[in-house]
Amino acid sequence: MEISWGRAMWRNFLGQSPDWYKLALLVFLIVNPFIFLANPFIAGWLLVAEFIFTLAMALKCYPLLPGGLLAIEAVIIGMTSAAHVREEVAANLEVLLLLMFMVAGIYFMKQLLLFIFTRLLLSIRSKMVLSLAFCVAAAFLSAFLDALTVVAVVISVAVGFYGIYHRVASSRGEENDMLDDSHIDPHYKTVLEQFRGFLRSLMMHAGVGTALGGVMTMVGEPQNLIIAKAAGWHFGDFFLRMSPVTVPVLVCGLLTCMLVEKMRWFGYGETLPEKVRDVLQQFDDQSRKKRTRQDKIKLIVQAVIGVWLVTALALHLAEVGLIGLSVIILATALTGVTDEHAIGKAFTESLPFTALLTVFFSIVAVIIDQHLFAPIIQFVLQASEHAQLTLFYLFNGLLSSISDNVFVGTIYINEAKAAMENGAISLKQFELLAVAINTGTNLPSVATPNGQAAFLFLLTSALAPLIRLSYGRMVWMALPYTIVLTLIGLLCVEFTLAPATEWMTQAGWLATLS
């Protein structure tokens, strides 16, 4: 018997999301207009809380859908206007270009990145050195490339290697289902569990590495570019201003990587089983023999384009998104990717998040129009200038650990800049606050997958169920990094940021917003 029209519509609404989630969103949409009529300020905060809820529940439904419905309703009932949303989007065009073109550009360099991580995995036998190498490589790449893409590449390597060994262990060849362990004998299962633990630890080290590197440069994370634009900083300025906090944090993060591997704490310390290494080495040897001269030329071309990318970013030869577009053009033209559909695949990772970011800007428009953060900012600005840095860092860190850090960073930098323009804080203090906001947004957000887009991408990837990486396990394995990064970042904001910035300014290293 066919279901009723109402039931059919209910099933279509937000698809496979749980019924309680659908019901919660409907309640939000129904009550918001009435609360807005009664008290716009409370309604505005309720909208922000609802939007953060959709971000926290990203595994139930991609936030673009529920968040977009809330944003559309907010415009319709007058919490903000379509014109203001357009202004916010226009003001952040560089960030949208970054997501559209830079992420797509790096897609065409995946072969080179796969080659790098494969060589690391098979060349280094010490697990501690290998973990450190993955963390450093991910940090370096994330300083210039998109963290999502770096994690996507490491996932590709891990899935590929897992599949190779799983086929051998199950003796099922190409028909093998990687999620099915029923055909694997007990001996192989023990080795497979050890291999899973090994891959889990490598993925977490690489994921944290993207956060360590991503905080250091203006292109490492989308919110960095928003903050850099608000402060008027270019690539070199941004790196130098962040360095009093980010360099000590990087060093301590790498020491944490070595410590948890050495002590086998928090689920780390598993080594690559020799039987697995033999299988993977044999497969890699066969792949290298099959590599043609044309394939080798592609790797060389991608390496040269990588040099161009780093140089163009460092010298600020063009807007970040346009540099990304140049990477797309050069990489496709010189490696022979000419089919429209093949090029289109490069944009599938970035466009959903680009659309979600546009919804963020709608919520930011509501926050500005309803003056939602005015009480918080007034509270912070009443403190001493020294205490303001700590408070901004902590408020950003708390919100970023449960919500998306792009959203949080955008809100706070807008409020800090408004305070400067209104004369509430000096230019010098604003520039220090921008560093506190950026580091507070990036570092504590490793606590949960909700804060870091790269972590969320890993959790929702095809790899997570294969290596038994659940939400809880990810939070547990991230805990030592969360504690170290947050505390060292806080201490640096408190004690080293102001004197180091003053010294660099006097030395003539830093440009100042005019």
From Swiss-Prot:
Topological relation to the membrane, as annotated: Multi-pass membrane protein
Keyword Manganese in record: no
Keywords for this protein: Antiport, Cell inner membrane, Cell membrane, Ion transport, Membrane, Sodium, Sodium transport, Transmembrane, Transmembrane helix, Transport
Domain of life according to the entry: Bacteria
Subcellular location: Cell inner membrane
One Gene Ontology cellular component: plasma membrane
Family annotation (InterPro entries): Na+/H+_antiporter_NhaB
Keyword Cell membrane found: yes
Catalyses which reaction(s): 2 Na(+)(in) + 3 H(+)(out) = 2 Na(+)(out) + 3 H(+)(in)
Pfam families: NhaB
Annotated transmembrane regions: 23-43, 63-83, 97-117, 120-140, 144-164, 202-222, 238-258, 303-323, 357-377, 391-411, 447-467, 475-495
MF (Gene Ontology): sodium:proton antiporter activity
PANTHER family, per the entry: NA(+)_H(+) ANTIPORTER NHAB, TRANSPORTER ARSB-RELATED
UniProt function note: Na(+)/H(+) antiporter that extrudes sodium in exchange for external protons.
Family classification: Belongs to the NhaB Na(+)/H(+) (TC 2.A.34) antiporter family.
HAMAP family reported in the protein's UniProt record: NhaB
The protein's name in its UniProt record: Na(+)/H(+) antiporter NhaB
Classification lineage: Bacteria, Pseudomonadati, Pseudomonadota, Gammaproteobacteria, Enterobacterales
